[in-house]
Amino acid sequence: MGSCWSDGSYAGGGMVGVGGGANSSAATPNDAVDYYLKSRGYNGLFSQIELSFSASNLRDRDVISKSDAMVVVYTKGRDGTLAELFRSEVVLNSLNPKWIKNFTIGYQFEIVQTLLFRVYDIDTQFQNSKEELLKLDEQQFLGEATCTLSEVVTKSNRTIALELMRKEGVAAQTQPQHNGKLIVHAEESLASKTNTEIVFRGLNLESKDTFSKSDPFLVISKIVEHGTPIPVSKTEVLKNDPNPLWKPVSLSVQQVGSKDSPLVIECLDFNGNGNHDLIGKVQKSLSDLEKLHLAGQGINLALPTGVGHKHEDRVLKSQLFVDKFTETVQHTFLEYLASGFELNFMVAIDFTASNGNPRLPDSLHYIDPTGRLNAYQRAIVEVGEVLQFYDSDKRFPAWGFGARPIDIPVSHCFNLNGSSTYCEVDGIQGIMNAYNGALFNVSFAGPTLFGPVINAAATIASDSLAQSAKKYYVLLIITDGVITDLQETRDSIVSASDLPLSILIVGVGGADYKEMEVLDGDKGEKLESSSGRIASRDIVQFVALRDIQYGEVSVVEALLAELPTQFLTYMRNRNITPTTTTPSST
């Protein structure tokens, strides 16, 4: 496993790409609409998780009776700061309490959500007080435990048993050895699984074009408090059609908030410059749309006129109908994880000469003696910290490219650990150790080629697919420059698009990454191989570190936001469903 080569192919294959060979790679109106929506916040996967709590063998701090326990939940930031999120009710006189009150939290794949749980014995004099008014420093501390939300949801039965420990900073000898266990169980909200399929039809849409009919499409957005509506779905663009019948659109109840949450449905006339004209809009909930479907009635679009207090809506003759409204329950990302599917992390690091001499402070590979991470180390750690929870053995393939290892010619895919036979290392720290060792055991060279490392990752994914393994692979490529094998890289990506593989690319340094962005399907360009084959799905996500390092979105969030969707697209394209597994003991 892990052999590298440079012939632009990989052992094994995959299905022929959906769409066939003769399609153009030019961006279509529908691709441009995708990019337009993403610029307005259409992104990411969000699931509502309900956590329930119980405990066993709590420490008894009461003299006459047993403890009266309450659990408090905090979120823990990267800097260690705590923010309280939830308090349970108080369960009286029990060392094995089962709390009734549950805690609901939004699961976000791209963020490490660290939770801290503290259990208190509530003093008798406060038992008639509301939980939220209790002063915790006046209660007896029974123990605390911490874990990430990812650790809970990746368990086969979504249950984790945590040993309650003393508070951080309290001397070990002052604390009894046994404080009991806290059991945390997660359930995904049904709203996350409930999918609504809707077919919209327009009638007598007004023309916004002078010499032709409009090219209409719909954008469905949810209304958020104190903010611009956020797009959650859209239809395709239909050319020159005043009476369009669009393909079905899918919405989960979770996406929109609830079935009664108001939605803005905009009908727009597509323009190639991105400035789409508003034909008209309506505001309706899913419940309203269902009623329109059952009644067979249309609703008139309205066009806002005027501004400020003079704002009015002009009701149009143009109408919108709901020809189909069905609700189904779909498999979710978390269901696949619970049934045993894993995400396997891989990394490939650029050692080309343009990075600079690693012994000098101006090098992108410079190891700061103060411990401050360079850009390569940051990307490895931050992406790895998220993905490691989804890989049971935490053995990660790691490669370098663009350098001359000891005793061999320049290689565009060599094992980072220095081995000639295997590429895996143990854990994120193993990657960091192999990276640090390689810096001074290879000679930086060039050029910058991606094809060989993508082919190496594709080989592993292809072999896993042949064995029907429940694995999906994520390759992180970190680079400082523009690739010189653009077409070969396109070919590799198109071939890999049928495999259980996604590719994350981080650009470090000040290079011009326009060519790199072509590989990322976010901007509506379909990747085409040299043989004319079209990628069956988008598997690449690219970010330039300089573009976001001072912004509000972290490198990890920008890279990983689309990964669950890419995973689900692969599973649904191949009709792979989660299988029920027997719950294992914690």
Curated annotation (Swiss-Prot):
Subunit structure: Interacts with BAP1 and BAP2.
Pfam family, one: C2
Cofactor: Ca(2+)
One annotated GO molecular function: metal ion binding
Family: Belongs to the copine family.
Alphabetic keyword roster: Calcium, Cell membrane, Lipoprotein, Membrane, Metal-binding, Myristate, Plant defense, Repeat
Protein name according to UniProt: Protein BONZAI 2
SMART domains: C2, VWA
Keyword Lipoprotein belongs to the record: yes
GO biological process: defense response
Origin species: Arabidopsis thaliana
Tissues where this protein is expressed: Expressed in roots, leaves and stems. Expressed in young growing tissues.
Localization per record: Cell membrane
Residues covalently joined to lipid (N-myristoyl glycine): 2
UniProt cross-references to CDD domains, sorted A to Z: C2A_Copine, C2B_Copine, vWA_copine_like
VWFA domain location: 344-563
